[in-house]
A protein has these predicted regions:
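Metal-dependent phosphodiesterase/phospholipase catalytic core, i.e.
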Residues: 1-103, 126-129, 143-145
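C-terminal active-site rim and adjoining tail of enzyme catalytic domains
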Residues: 25-29, 106-207
Length: 207
């Protein structure tokens, strides 16, 4: 069976009895996995980007510690350093945390400076709805700090119009993925992984 409504209306056993639907709305054979099950499956294989996990930051850390995957999971939030530190204390220093900064907002540079001053993140996820000189200046500032740059190319508002559809449907990969790479991005979130990989190989950027 499949379900409707909010997950918190069901017990775990009830959720486990359900099956996920595919993109066309058809029931599949797949169950809803727990976070612990996912991390056990991924252990020693890949990095996991937890997109909606900030509200469960400390709970997530306990699961990561239990499964031995603390170094394989990236937690993130669109919040200033002071708030994240106040809400999570020493746990923040034990996990890989990636700030999400919306570069088109007035608070962007202050948010970047706060993290660079206090914790030197390994990476920043940079979100921007335009590619103005000011946005590019802030991208350069993050790049020059030594932190890796994560850019999401799923839709235009996340990457200043340099999105997946521009690469694939408009046949402009250089203006999409190429532009993102030229900004220094080392991490790209895409719905077209095979095509992006092909592009990287053609540009001699991937073996």
């Amino acid at each position: 069976m499949t379900g409707t409504g909010s997950p918190d209306e069901y017990t775990l056993a009830e959720l486990k009895a359900m099956r996920l639907r595919n993109g066309a709305g058809i029931k599949t054979r797949h169950q809803i996995p727990t976070f612990e099950e996912v991390m056990n499956l991924c252990k020693g294989k890949i990095m996991v980007n937890v997109d909606k996990g900030y509200d469960y930051f400390k709970d997530a850390y306990e699961v990561l510690k239990k499964t031995g995957t603390v170094d394989q999971c990236i937690m993130k939030a669109s919040l200033p350093y002071e708030q994240v530190k106040a809400e999570n204390g020493e746990v923040l220093d034990k996990m890989i945390f990636m700030p999400v900064v919306q570069l088109h907002k007035e608070s962007a540079e202050a948010t970047i400076d706060g993290y660079l001053e206090h914790m030197k993140p390994q990476a920043f996820e940079l979100v921007f709805n335009n590619d103005s000189p000011e946005v590019q200046r802030l991208i350069k500032k993050v790049r020059d700090s030594g932190a890796k740059i994560f850019i999401n190319s799923l839709w235009p508002e996340l990457c200043g119009g340099h999105d997946d559809d521009r690469a694939v449907e408009l046949h402009q990969p250089d203006e999409s993925w190429g532009w993102i790479i030229d900004q220094g991005a080392k991490l790209i979130q895409t719905d077209r992984p095979a095509l992006l990989l092909q592009y990287l190989k053609e540009k001699k950027l991937h073996e």
